[in-house]
Amino acid sequence: MSSDTKKPLPYQRILLKLSGEALMGEGKYGIHPPTLMGIAEEVIELAQAGVEVALVIGGGNIFRGVAGATEGMDRASADYMGMLATCINSMAMQDALEKKGLHTRVLSAIKMEQIAEPYIRRRAVRHLEKGRVVIFAAGTGNPYFTTDTAASLRAMEINAQVILKATKVDGVYSADPKKDPTARRYRSLTYMDVLKQNLNVMDSTAISLCMDNKLPIIVFDLTQRGNIRRAVLGEGDIGTLVGGSETVWA
């Protein structure tokens, strides 16, 4: 074997789940272009390394369906508005990636042909095989389901090997580390421990889907530049692995 033989990738196909708030930067609303471009550059690094990348982006930086419902809106209508917010974020990410020369496709669970392709599973897989980044918009297309659940569903449909759940902390903790100085980080967690302890990873529907299909989740800190690449390539102790055989402290 030659010395320049490439090391096999731990994950060939991944789904990156971003919250809408991840695009705000230090702002309180909307999209912060430098933050958006920084995330796009990390996605490009993965694609250039040969990783097939799909994304699901929330819409909470623009509108959150649950919040609208608590203010008296019809829940289904509020959720559909949230789905439209995810489409705005998906288009913004597509623009950022394509400005850097990376081919992308936005596939929407709600038909809007002028701005996105309709979601078809086989088409999504084909785009990935051709080296395009696929951005899944509009959640599952159904109210009452979160974008975390959409991420789990789409990851399974495209046969992704892992979900990367981007957050503002470096993994899953026993308590909120900003409020409790005794909080400890987990290196790995079983799905059942996440559900039993009601840990803030994803909603229970999303976790249950991953558990039933043995799909691992890596929860990591998006604010540290380079962590997306490090998590995918297995470089160092990055975040918390959900789906391990046992629960282990970091």
Curated annotation (Swiss-Prot):
UniProt: ATP binding residues: 17-20, 60, 64, 167, 173, 176
User: Which molecular function GO terms apply here?
Assistant: ATP binding; UMP kinase activity
Tell me which domain of life the UniProt entry assigns to the organism this sequence originates from: Bacteria
State where UMP binds.
Answer: 59, 79, 140-147
From the UniProt record, give one GO term of the biological process aspect. Answer: UDP biosynthetic process
Alphabetic keyword roster: ATP-binding, Cytoplasm, Kinase, Nucleotide-binding, Pyrimidine biosynthesis, Transferase
The UniProt entry, under InterPro entries, shows: AceGlu_kinase-like_sf, Asp/Glu/Uridylate_kinase, Uridylate_kinase, Uridylate_kinase_bac
Q: In which pathway does it act?
A: Pyrimidine metabolism; CTP biosynthesis via de novo pathway; UDP from UMP (UMPK route): step 1/1
Question: Might you give the EC number(s) for this enzyme?
Answer: 2.7.4.22
Q: Which Pfam families match?
A: AA_kinase
**Its catalytic activity?**
UMP + ATP = UDP + ADP
Q: Can you say where in the cell this protein is located?
A: Cytoplasm
Q: How is its activity regulated?
A: Inhibited by UTP.
Per the record, its GO cellular-component terms are: cytosol
Tell me the function of this protein: Catalyzes the reversible phosphorylation of UMP to UDP.
**Which family is it part of?**
Belongs to the UMP kinase family.
Q: Which PANTHER family match?
A: URIDYLATE KINASE, URIDYLATE KINASE PUMPKIN, CHLOROPLASTIC
Oligomeric state and interaction partners are given as: Homohexamer.
Annotated protein name in UniProt: Uridylate kinase
Which species is listed as the source? Answer: Myxococcus xanthus (strain DK1622)
Q: The organism's lineage?
A: Bacteria, Pseudomonadati, Myxococcota, Myxococcia, Myxococcales
